[in-house]
Curated annotation (Swiss-Prot):
Keywords: Ubl conjugation pathway. Belongs to the VHL family. InterPro entries: VHL_beta_dom, VHL_beta_dom_sf, VHL_sf, VHL_tumour_suppress_b/a_dom. GO terms for biological process: protein ubiquitination; response to hypoxia. Interacts with hif-1 (hydroxylated on 'Pro-621'); the interaction induces hif-1 degradation. May be a component of the cullin E3 ubiquitin ligase complex. Involved in the response to variation in environmental oxygen levels by targeting the hypoxia-inducible transcription factor hif-1 for proteasomal degradation when oxygen levels are normal (around 20%). By regulating hif-1 expression, plays a role in iron homeostasis, aging, heat acclimation and progeny size. Mediates resistance to enteropathogenic E.coli. Mediates susceptibility to B.thuringiensis pore-forming toxins. Not involved in P.aeruginosa susceptibility. Pathway: Protein modification; protein ubiquitination. One of its GO terms (cellular component) is nucleus. Disruption phenotype: Increased mortality induced by B.thuringiensis pore-forming toxins Cry21A and Cry21B. Increased mortality and sensitivity to paralysis induced by enteropathogenic E.coli infection. Increased mortality upon heat stress. RNAi-mediated knockdown causes an enhanced resistance to polyglutamine or amyloid-beta-mediated paralysis and an increase in adult life span. It comes from Caenorhabditis elegans. This is von Hippel-Lindau tumor suppressor homolog.
Length: 174
């Protein structure tokens, strides 16, 4: 897309995975400040997203994780990227002192989108079989973008549907 609304390489999830170098447990609270539900994912060592939960607006999720375990959040409806502490990927950091137990707060917020992206994503609320007729009057480039959004929504739905409830991040081997 020419306007930069597709961030990074256009993938739903970054090409990142967890490592097992640090076994210090880190407590995190994800708080949804978006106007819509979001899904919270841990990126496992195989670089696969593992869904930990869906947060309604103003709800939170408490988890235990480890350093070098990346976390991301996506809008539940279509997989649109949102920010975690103003970043696309959250990397937990342990407390500064070993004996101090602290829960890190991670605020999930909306990303700024162009009007073009907002308009294109508005078609995602329609029945997918009706969208081709609804976008016929749009410029060809916009039609391709809407089709791309529909493909990403389908891909996201498949990822979420195959997610198995997690056993929890595994403690690194010593």
């Amino acid at each position: 897309m020419s306007d930069g609304s597709m961030d990074d390489d256009g993938r739903l999830f970054p090409d990142l995975g967890s490592s097992t170098h640090d076994n210090r447990e880190i407590r995190v609270r994800f708080l949804n400040r978006c106007a819509y539900p979001v899904d919270v994912f841990w990126l496992n060592p195989s670089k696969q997203p593992t869904k930990y939960g869906t947060l309604a607006q103003k709800k939170y999720l408490d988890i235990k994780t480890f350093k070098d375990h990346p976390w991301v959040a996506r809008r539940s409806f279509d997989g649109c990227k949102v920010l975690v502490n103003e970043k696309e990927v959250f990397w937990p950091e342990p407390a500064p002192r070993m004996n101090l137990i602290v829960r890190n707060h991670c605020v999930i917020t909306m990303k700024v989108q162009s009007l073009r992206e907002i308009a294109g994503r508005s078609f995602l609320r329609h029945n997918p079989t009706e969208v081709p007729n609804k976008i016929k009057g749009l410029p060809r480039e916009l039609q391709f973008e809407v089709k791309h959004f529909l493909d990403r929504k389908q891909e996201y739905s498949e990822i979420v549907c195959r997610s198995i409830p997690p056993p929890g991040p595994q403690r690194p081997q010593q």
